[in-house]
């Protein structure tokens, strides 16, 4: 006799021990429903025999072994106790993801096992003795939460997969298709699914009845209330403790466990159920999703192919059960079969299906909050830093061994190099000191020479003006004092070079002096140095340096002054600005446009030398012309009359 299934062991004991080790197999419980009244009327007999609490005889040569086998005489309370759902609830409170789903042929009692019989009428409650696994789990869970010290938040969602479309059974409006998404943190999830928070058993029962009333049901030959969709009711348990805090990221799911109840639609043969039209389309969709689920289970059984790609995306059902089948959850499968001989082929198919499923293993892991993850992260970082410290210490020891022979030479070389740099800096500092001293001496010499030349220029200018005065007066003539004469208009030509003992008069025109300098462009100094009065000027005839410039278009200024003239005039202007000229100096010249600024300090010494030489030549030529010309008569001019230009 061929025996298939799990090895010997007690299901309750294995569930009470919890998920030990890296992998935990899917727990499978088999329930055989009683013979229906229709089957008894047709005279059909039971072909299944339970030999013990874990073995089912499917024929003379076939036997299947599961975690628990429940015959037709077992009640709903016996099923709840044998399945170990309480242990799953405890794991969910500790943060694990737990799933309970039923599987079997249509009409085998899957919905009855989970939710009990359908209500006989509106407002008529189901008898407590007939309540299914879901109602009993809800009552136990809420009673358990009341005795916990820490606050617990309970929420619920309810959906169905009908013709490969996910519909929300708790939506406020009419159910509409919802998309199934995936991310790294949550895995597969339904977007925009309504999650309702509850705090009492009555509120949760109301949510369950609302979902059951919206679920698609139809009648066919084998079942008068056949479910035409897969239904998933999920309880989210968020328990806050001192070591576990709620998630602060709104994009992540709440930290805590969940308990999911999955009522799969039964597989069916269209020929046996007599489905036509829409019922046949629903049957095809149900069979296709169950086939995808069986294919994923077969691939998960192969150790080599389990590490490869598992096609969970082939169906919406396999997407939502991916975490329960091959992920981080704890899964319980309740296989329901019919004992009738008419359903024996489908019953054997269900038994083989459940036998393969209990060999699938998962890796249960409770999600950790950021606070709970911190010690593990710190420990990992500490190990990495210790490893890096050992590696760097080893490299440092190797470098010390290699550099031990070169340490003495490096120190000596560094000392010699430092001494040489200090010597170079000292020599450079001394050279800069000497250069600075030489530059200061050159500056002082240039300033002294400039001062001497300026004094010589001043003296020569005074001599020039004095010579011009004596030449105009003639020898032996003393002009009368203007104080005894009629008043004359004041002179604006020159500052007072010489003055009368009782008043200040101009030595050239013999009129009282009004101020020190003439206004530019108003009065012109008479020509006293040029004896020629002809129409054309000789090339050597130039106006005195202190004369103001005339307009370029006038007859008195036929040409512009040369650059050398303006250079000499600029030197006189700078001396007047620096207050190095005696009060008897000529008035300030007007600076011509577009003239480069003169050099100051030592740069102006050559110009002063040139001016000194020019003044000497001018004084000599003036004295020679004075000797060659006869003196002018006394009556030729009056004391207040200005000499005409020659």
Swiss-Prot record:
ATP binds at residues 104-111. Residues 1-25, 529-565, 579-646 are annotated as: Disordered. Expressed in fetal liver, adult brain and pancreatic islet as well as in kidney tumors, uterus cancer and pancreatic cancer. Gene3D superfamilies: Kinesin motor domain. GO terms for biological process: microtubule-based movement. Pfam families: Kinesin. Residues 25-360 form the Kinesin motor domain. The modification Phosphoserine is found at residues 6, 14, 369, 638. Residues 372-467 form a coiled coil. The keyword Cytoplasm applies. One of its GO terms (molecular function) is microtubule binding. One of its GO terms (cellular component) is kinesin complex. Residues 540-551, 584-595 have a biased composition (Pro residues). It is found in: Cytoplasm, Cytoskeleton. Residues 1-13 have a biased composition (Basic and acidic residues). PROSITE patterns: KINESIN_MOTOR_1 (PS00411), KINESIN_MOTOR_2 (PS50067). It comes from the Eukaryota. InterPro entries: Kinesin-like_fam, Kinesin_motor_CS, Kinesin_motor_dom, Kinesin_motor_dom_sf, P-loop_NTPase. The keyword Zinc does not apply. Keywords: ATP-binding, Coiled coil, Cytoplasm, Cytoskeleton, Disease variant, Intrahepatic cholestasis, Microtubule, Motor protein, Nucleotide-binding, Phosphoprotein. SMART domains: KISc. It is linked to Cholestasis, progressive familial intrahepatic, 8: An autosomal recessive form of progressive cholestasis, a disorder characterized by early onset of cholestasis that progresses to hepatic fibrosis, cirrhosis, and end-stage liver disease. PFIC8 onset is in early infancy. Belongs to the TRAFAC class myosin-kinesin ATPase superfamily. Kinesin family. This is Kinesin-like protein KIF12. It comes from Homo sapiens (Human).
């Amino acid at each position: 006799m061929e025996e298939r299934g799990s090895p010997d062991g007690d299901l309750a004991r294995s569930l009470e021990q919890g998920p030990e080790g890296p992998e935990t197999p899917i727990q499978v419980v088999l329930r055989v429903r009683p013979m229906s009244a229709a089957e008894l009327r047709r005279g059909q007999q039971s072909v299944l025999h339970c030999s013990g609490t874990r073995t089912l005889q499917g024929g003379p040569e076939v036997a299947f072994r599961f975690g628990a086998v429940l015959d037709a005489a077992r009640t709903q309370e016996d099923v709840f106790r044998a399945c170990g759902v309480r242990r799953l609830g405890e794991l969910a409170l500790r943060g694990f993801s737990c799933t309970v789903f039923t599987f079997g042929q249509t009409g085998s009692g899957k919905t009855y096992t989970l939710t009990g019989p359908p209500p006989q009428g509106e407002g008529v409650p189901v008898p407590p003795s007939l309540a299914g696994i879901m109602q009993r789990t809800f009552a136990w869970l809420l009673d358990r939460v009341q005795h916990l010290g820490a606050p617990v938040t309970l929420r619920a969602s309810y959906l169905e997969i009908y013709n490969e479309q996910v519909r929300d059974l708790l939506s406020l409006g009419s159910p509409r298709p919802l998309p199934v998404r995936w991310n790294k943190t949550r895995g597969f999830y339904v977007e925009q699914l309504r999650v309702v928070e509850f705090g009492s058993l009555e509120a949760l029962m109301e949510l369950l009845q609302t979902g059951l009333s919206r679920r698609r049901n139809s009648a066919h030959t084998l079942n008068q209330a056949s479910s035409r969709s897969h239904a998933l009711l999920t309880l989210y348990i968020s328990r806050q403790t001192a070591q576990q805090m709620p998630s602060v990221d709104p994009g992540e799911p709440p930290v805590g466990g969940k308990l999911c109840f999955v009522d799969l639609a039964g597989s069916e043969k269209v020929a046996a159920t007599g489905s036509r039209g829409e019922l046949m389309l629903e049957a095809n969709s149900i069979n296709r999703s169950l086939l995808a689920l069986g294919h994923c289970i077969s691939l998960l059984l192969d150790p080599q192919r389990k590490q490869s790609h598992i096609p969970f995306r082939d169906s919406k059902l396999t997407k939502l059960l991916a975490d329960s089948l091959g992920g981080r959850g704890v899964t319980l499968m309740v296989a329901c079969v019919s004992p009738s001989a008419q359903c024996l082929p489908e019953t054997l198919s269900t038994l083989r299906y459940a036998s393969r499923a209990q060999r699938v293993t998962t890796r249960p892991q409770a999600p950790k909050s950021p606070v709970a993850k911190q010690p593990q992260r710190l420990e990992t970082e500490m190990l990495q830093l210790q490893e890096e410290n050992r590696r760097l210490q080893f490299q440092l020891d190797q470098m010390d061994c290699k550099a031990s022979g070169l340490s003495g030479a490096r120190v000596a070389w560094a000392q010699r190099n430092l001494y040489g740099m200090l010597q170079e800096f000292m020599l450079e500092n001394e050279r800069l000191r000497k250069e600075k001293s030489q530059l200061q001496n050159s500056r002082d010499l240039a300033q002294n020479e400039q001062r001497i030349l300026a004094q010589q220029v001043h003296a020569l200018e005074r001599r020039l003006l004095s010579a011009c005065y004596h030449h105009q007066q003639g020898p032996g003539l003393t002009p009368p004092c203007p104080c005894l004469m009629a008043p004359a208009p004041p002179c604006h030509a020159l500052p007072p070079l010489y003055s009368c003992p009782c008043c200040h008069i101009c030595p050239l025109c013999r009129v009282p002096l009004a101020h020190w300098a003439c206004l530019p462009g108003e009065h012109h100094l008479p020509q006293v140095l040029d004896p020629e009065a002809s129409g054309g000027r000789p090339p050597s005839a130039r106006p005195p340096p202190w004369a103001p410039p005339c307009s370029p278009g006038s007859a008195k200024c036929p040409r512009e002054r040369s650059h050398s003239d303006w250079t000499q005039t600029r030197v006189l202007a700078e001396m007047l600005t620096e207050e190095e000229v005696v009060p008897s100096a000529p008035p300030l010249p007007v600076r011509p446009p577009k003239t480069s600024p003169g050099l100051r300090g030592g740069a102006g010494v050559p110009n002063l030398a040139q001016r000194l030489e020019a003044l000497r030549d001018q004084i000599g030529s003036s004295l020679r012309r004075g000797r060659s010309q006869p003196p002018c008569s006394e009556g030729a001019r009056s004391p207040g009359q200005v000499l005409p230009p020659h």
